[in-house]
Structure formats: structure tokens, C-alpha cells
Amino acid sequence: MNLKTVFRAAAVFMGMWILGMWFAPELIMDQYGWQYTPGLTMMMRFMGLSMAALATLHWLIPEWSGNNISKFGMVSGIFWALFGAFGVYDLALNNVPHNANTIIGAVINFVFAILFYLNSKKEAK
């Protein structure tokens, strides 16, 4: 696996969340035990748009970055680790239910962080 593949896989993973936020917000809210409200639904649409921007950047960074891809990979890895840390934090404080979706979601964020880090180190050599 190379860094370009990691960026693309991350974009696809975000794409699944984007679809959920735009077309099945109730399903997403149910996973986290949130009450369905019109305000939260509207916020999910905007979060989906923000995630679409990030997914687009993840998809295009390998094309734009040239020899600097490892620098982008390191920065991306830091943010993926932060997303994972927030997931663990919310689990620890019981802000979200302890179920497979929330636990696996945090783990996947850490997996992407590790993949970005390892592949960035490999590309930098």
C-alpha cells in the first residue's frame, strides 16, 4: 500500500459518511443515541458538506502534492488521530453509546492515522 492509496481509501470512507449525513441522517443519529430534531438534521447536512470538502482534498492531494505528499500525509495522520481521540473521549465520558459502530469508528480513525504515518515515513525516504 502506498500513500496515494491511503488518501483515496480515506476519501472513500468519508464518502460513506457523507451519504449517511445527507440521505440518512436519522440512521446516523440513532447510532449515537441522539434525538432526531430538525436543527440536528440541518447541522448534519452542513457537516456532510464539510466532510465532502475534506474528502475531495484527500482524493486530490496525491495529484497536487508531487514530491511533498509525505508532508500532507503526516498532517492528515495527525488529524485522523485527533478524530480517533475524540471518539475515545466521547466513549469514556458516555457521550455516545458503547456499541460496535462507535467503537469501530474510533478504531478506524486510528488505523488511518497509523497508515498515514507509516506510509508518509516510507514515501519520505
Predicted stretch roles:
Residues L3-V6, M14-T41:
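Membrane-helix boundary elements
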Residues F7, A11-M14, G48-M51, G73, ...:
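Residues within membrane-spanning alpha-helices of integral membrane proteins
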Residues M16-W17, L40-P62, V75-L82:
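Core segments of alpha-helical transmembrane spans in multipass integral membrane proteins
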Residues W22, W59, V88, A113-Y117:
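Membrane-embedded alpha-helical segments of multi-pass transporters/permeases
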Residues G33-T41, K71, V96-A106:
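Non-cytosolic membrane-interface motifs at loop->transmembrane helix junctions
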Residues L57-S70, L91:
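Juxtamembrane helix-break-helix junctions at the cytosolic face
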Residues E63, A85-T102:
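Membrane-helix boundary connector in multi-pass membrane proteins
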Residues N109-K125:
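Membrane-water interface at the C-terminal end of transmembrane alpha helices
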